[in-house]
Amino acid sequence: MGTQHRIKVDVPDRVLYTVGSCVLVIGSIGITGNLLVLYAFYSNKRLRTPANYFIMNLAASDFLMSATQAPICFLNSMHTEWILGDIGCNFYVFCGALFGITSMMTLLAISVDRYCVITKPLQSIKRSSKKRSCIIIAFVWLYSLGWSVCPLFGWSSYIPEGLMISCTWDYVSYSPANRSYTMMLCCFVFFIPLIIIFHCYLFMFLAIRSTGRNVQKLGSTYNRKSNVSQSVKSEWKLAKIAFVAIVVFVLSWSPYACVTLIAWAGYAKTLNPYSKSVPAVIAKASAIYNPIIYAIIHPRYRRTIRSAVPCLRFLIRISPSDLSTSSVNESSFRASMSSRHSFAARNKSSCVSSISAAETTWSDMELEPVEAARKKQQPHRSRSFSKQAEEETGLLLKTQSCNVLTGEKVAVSSISLHDPFERSFGENAPELLLRPSCLRTSSLPFGLNSSSTEENADTSDMEVQEQHQMEASSH
């Protein structure tokens, strides 16, 4: 770090005091707000979902950003120059770069997660887990760490900037190392993630619009219309919250990115101390926006904070609708996937509907002994068809033999039941439902067990013997 960077800037001291005071206020709000976000998501178990782990990570990085940047900047502004030397400058910029890049990459992870949940719900159900979220978060931190330590090992360097009360990487010097680092950092930390984020939200919007149209078309056929609509609204509501946070973050860092690109293009002399320091302050103020966004939009977060911090009740208000009903964005991103699953596989849903209809037909066509016993054993029709089939298969295993007359009745019953099932399900029906053994099981009288069969067999043998005796006596 050269001595030319330690020259005191020729600006009034009151300007430095004002900037330092603003930074301190911003940092205090960021520390308090993000601590409240972390407390809300930690204390409320319903908020601790795999998707919300990314929000907690974002709050953690914003908290650390405010805690490390604001006090140091305020201290130097009170002395009207940088007083912490090279080590303090390296620490200041390293922390700012690490936590700032982590916030950007976390927003990217949130966007990709929302994209997968809304456009590929079936795959997201299988992949969703807290362990997976933690692995992604660990990768985000390692990625940010890699970019932050590069200037410490010679690829660019950390120097004081602007009003000389803060530090940044050297984007002013026109050296190959500084220019390459500045361009790579802007591309892989800002512009490329930004393109991916807007790509995700574009396709999310198209998927939501397409799903809404399909729900309207299928509303007369499916009684799950309200569930699917609620699921779609829930997913889109949560995606909009993340989108607002992303837009605010991008707007905060865009001026700083523009300043670095101007210097990278060779026009560093056109930048004055104010044009260098003010964008940096705006960028680091992005740490305070997320708590405000969640306090305004997220009802469960508001309720948690109100109950934990009574003194904030006059600032955080809850509408009657939030108190009476659960908001659409309270549920987990994955909790509503069951209705999304049924809608995404609507061809299979029609088969499930056919199962329900066929189940009613089956109960109407059963023999009276079976129907009477079934009413005792199955008080509710809400049990799954597969469970009923298992019970009926167990009944079939108890049956070992039957007489000719009963066998004919069973055969007739199975034939009469096979036709409506085949018409209802078609070729795509589950194999279990078309299995003749399952159909015959439902038609077997409960008295047709092994003991009754043996009694019938003994009675038949006695009748045959008596008939032979009568024939012998007549002869």
Curated annotation (Swiss-Prot):
Extent of Acidic residues compositional bias: 455-464
GO annotations of cellular component type: plasma membrane
The family this protein is said to belong to: Belongs to the G-protein coupled receptor 1 family. Opsin subfamily.
Membrane topology: Multi-pass membrane protein
Start-end of Polar residues biased regions: 445-454
Gene Ontology terms: biological process: phototransduction; visual perception
An annotated Gene Ontology molecular function: photoreceptor activity
Compositionally biased region (Basic and acidic residues): 465-475
Alphabetized UniProt keyword annotations: Cell membrane, Chromophore, Disulfide bond, G-protein coupled receptor, Glycoprotein, Membrane, Photoreceptor protein, Receptor, Retinal protein, Sensory transduction, Transducer, Transmembrane, Transmembrane helix
InterPro entries attached to this UniProt entry: GPCR_opsins (IPR050125), GPCR_Rhodpsn (IPR000276), GPCR_Rhodpsn_7TM (IPR017452), Opsin (IPR001760), Retinal_BS (IPR027430)
UniProt subcellular location: Cell membrane
Official protein name in the record: Melanopsin
Region Disordered, annotated ranges: 370-390, 445-475
Gene source species: Podarcis siculus
